[in-house]
Amino acid sequence: MLVLTRRSHQVILIGDNIEIAPDRIGTSVVKFSVRASGYPIARGERPAAGDASKDGVLILARKCGEQILIGDHIVVTLLRICGSCVKVGVTAPPEVRILRDELAA
């Protein structure tokens, strides 16, 4: 698991087509913007057929310890809320590149 600290609207890039960023950081809940063209997105448990988003864009509220599943192999976990920032853990296969947006240029 790669752990990154992000502030509101700071993007994490996963692979070539996935972007996730905390939009609103509250004291106990964070709203994430998830853009994942071509990947099903689920709220934290493996979805039943037809139960996940297929359009690739979601706004999801997560509490500490809750997950967002992207495709079959990528898991994003809200680990901690630290005032105006969050610690996010990303678990992905070793061949999938994970970058902070500011390093991608």
What is the meaning of each model-derived region?
Residues 1-105:
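Compact, glycine-rich, soluble single-domain proteins
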